[in-house]
Design a protein with these regions (language model features):
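A residue-level signal for conserved active-site and pocket-lining positions in enzyme catalytic cores
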Residues: 30, 83, 120, 159, ...
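Conserved anion/nucleotide-ligand pocket segment
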Residues: 153-197
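Short glycine-rich anion-binding loops that position phosphate/pyrophosphate groups of nucleotides
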Residues: 36-38, 88-91, 121-122, 164
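Patatin-like phospholipase A catalytic core
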Residues: 8-9, 192-193, 197-210
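Short, well-ordered alpha-helix to beta-strand connector turns
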Residues: 57, 80, 113, 155-156, ...
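Short, active-site-adjacent cap segments at secondary-structure transitions
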Residues: 91, 123-126, 193-195
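Class I SAM-dependent methyltransferase SAM-binding "motif I" and its flanking Rossmann-like core
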Residues: 95-96, 103-165
Length: 210
C-alpha cells in the first residue's frame, strides 16, 4: 500500500506531515536525496526542506547518489524509515536514478509500505512519464535519457508543481493548458501537497501559506 507525501515545496507544507505520518515522525530516519539540485544555480530549497525535516525531529541522512556505490545506496534506503527526494531538474534526476538503479530501490521501498516524500522534481518523478515537465526543466541536463522519459510509474497522475508561485507560474499554467486534455494532471502550489494513502488521494493546503 503506497504512502506518499508529494509536495511542491516541502518546507511550506511540513506542518501537515506529522498528522499524515501518524504523529510518529520524531526520531525517524530519513534518507535525503538532493541529486536533482546538483546542476541548479538556485538551491536554497534543499537546505530549507532539510531543516524542516530536522525541525520535526527526524534524523536526516544525505544520500547524494551520483558518486556512491550501489551497495551503499541500497543499504541506506533499506534501513530508512522514509525516503525524501528533493527538487531540481526532473530529467537529470531521472537520468541519475536510472543510471544507479535507485529508481527500482525507491519503488521497492514504496511497495514495502514505507513512506515516500517528494518535493517538486521528487514528486513529479513518480509519474509514468515526465515528458510533460519539459517547459519547467531543461532537457539538456540529461543527455543520457535519449528521449526516453519513462519514470517510476508509481502514481497514475502527473504533478505540476509551483502553480501560482514565482518564477514558475506562467510555465506551470502553460503545462496544465497543454497537457490537461491528454494526461491526468494534478497541479499544486507551494502551499499544497498531494497525499496518497493506499487508494486514497487527496490535496491538502497548509494554513497561513501562499
Amino acid at each position: 500500500m503506497s504512502k506518499l507525501f508529494l509536495a511542491s515545496y516541502f518546507s511550506d507544507v511540513a506542518s501537515l506531515f506529522p498528522d499524515f505520518a501518524g504523529n510518529d515522525c520524531a526520531g525517524k530516519r530519513v534518507v535525503f536525496i538532493p541529486t536533482a539540485s546538483l546542476l541548479e544555480k538556485v538551491t536554497f530549497y534543499v537546505g530549507a526542506d532539510k531543516k524542516a525535516l530536522q525541525k520535526l525531529g527526524m534524523v536526516v541522512e544525505d544520500l547524494e547518489i551520483t558518486n556512491m556505490s550501489n551497495e551503499e545506496i541500497e543499504k541506506s534506503i533499506a534501513y530508512a524509515d522514509y525516503v525524501f527526494v528533493s527538487g531540481g531538474n526532473t530529467f537529470f534526476l531521472l537520468q541519475e536514478l536510472r543510471r544507479k538503479g535507485v529508481d527500482n530501490m525507491i519503488i521497492e521501498h514504496i511497495n514495502n509500505g514505507k513512506l515516500y516524500i517528494g518535493s517538486s522534481a521528487g514528486s513529479a518523478i513518480l509519474a509514468k512519464d515526465i515528458g510533460y515537465i519539459k517547459y519547467m526543466d531543461s532537457l539538456d541536463a540529461a543527455p543520457d535519457l535519449n528521449g526516453n522519459f519513462s519514470a517510476l510509474s508509481v502514481v497514475d497522475f502527473c504533478i505540476v508543481p509551483h502553480l501560482t508561485n514565482f518564477p514558475f507560474k506562467k510555465i506551470a499554467e502553460k503545462t496544465v493548458k497543454e497537457f490537461s486534455g491528454t494526461l491526468n494532471i494534478r497541479a499544486i502550489s507551494n502551499n499544497q501537497v498531494i497525499i496518497v494513502d493506499g487508494e486514497k488521494v487527496e490535496t491538502l493546503t497548509a494554513k497561513g501559506k501562499k
